Regions:
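Conserved SAM/SAH-binding beta-strand->alpha-helix loop
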Residues: 85
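Conserved Class I S-adenosyl-L-methionine
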Residues: 108, 194-228
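S-adenosyl-L-methionine
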Residues: 94-140
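Conserved class I S-adenosyl-L-methionine
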Residues: 55-64, 80
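A short glycine-rich, Lys/Arg-flanked "PGG" loop and its adjoining helix->strand segment in the class I
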Residues: 165-177
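Conserved beta-strand signature within the Rossmann-like core of class I S-adenosyl-L-methionine
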Residues: 178-186
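A short acidic, Gly/Pro-enriched loop at the edge of an enzyme's catalytic core
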Residues: 136-152
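Conserved alpha-helix/loop element of class I SAM-dependent methyltransferases that forms part
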Residues: 32-55
Length: 255
């Protein structure tokens, strides 16, 4: 079974996207507060608002349970969130409908705390819609890709695709000239998700190390790399187990 369709992962991602820092960060480790709210920070810190036209249109690929899509709606009048997981999209649609996320935070074993967290009231949820779709085959989804987007946001996606290069090759047609592409990834290349032959980086080529950022620059000739930034993030599994990672965020402008 796809792990992203399980109750466990849906609950963990709702917590990851919608919980307050105090609900995620373990007591006594205040320095980890900066690793919370990743779905918000990947937009708030990386979106180049001065480059946005009026009535900007955004595509959030691999939106998971949707918090980054709602954050994009602060600045864009239309936002389409797309994810391969039907459960994630159902959860995102439920938040859009109600204005809040309900989920259980695992404490230990079957012990859990029920939480309900509201979206900020100033976010216009009507600007956002969610669709299931395959990031590697966006042309077959129900979104209007031919109209182009002023922003494409893909957070922690590329190292979970079986063929990330196929996703990258769609981007020139997706992003309007002058539009921006926001990518984040910890570059955790694993054969569980991506055959090694399809990794973008993390290997030697003719005895020379190849990094993912270097490969992105090679594979995105229609884009200008504007900036990069390290964005730490924290995923809480239960009260005594956490995943701490550092994503590299990069912003690219369509030539």
């Amino acid at each position: 079974m796809n792990p992203y369709e399980t109750d466990k992962l849906v609950a963990e991602y709702l917590l990851f996207h919608y919980a307050s820092p105090e609900q995620v960060v373990p007591p006594g480790v205040p320095e980890m507060m900066a690793s919370a709210d990743f779905a918000v920070r990947s937009v708030a810190r990386m979106l180049q608002t001065d480059l946005l036209p009026r009535n900007a249109r955004a595509l959030d690929v691999g939106c998971a349970v949707g918090r980054s899509s709602f954050e994009l709606a602060r600045h864009c009048t239309e936002v389409v969130g797309v994810d391969f997981s039907h459960r994630f999209i159902a959860a995102a649609r439920a938040v859009k409908e109600s204005g809040y996320a309900e989920f259980n935070r695992c404490e230990e074993g079957h012990l859990a705390t029920a939480l309900r967290n509201f979206l900020p009231s100033e976010i216009d949820r009507r600007r956002v819609r969610f669709e299931t779709g395959d990031a590697m085959h966006l042309e077959s989804s129900s979104i209007r890709i031919n109209d182009g987007f002023d922003v494409v946001h893909a957070a922690n996606l590329i190292d979970r695709l079986s063929d990330p290069l196929r996703f990258l090759r769609q981007l020139p047609a997706l992003v309007k000239p002058g539009g921006q592409l926001i990518l984040t990834s910890p570059y955790t290349w694993l054969e569980d998700y991506t055959p090694q032959a399809n990794w973008l980086g993390g290997f030697y080529e003719n005895e020379r190390p190849v990094t993912t950022l270097e490969r992105l620059q090679r594979e995105l000739p229609d884009f200008l790399l504007l900036t990069t930034q390290d964005l730490p993030f924290l995923i809480r599994e239960h009260a005594r187990k956490y995943q701490w990672s550092i994503a590299q965020a990069s912003v690219w402008v369509r030539r």
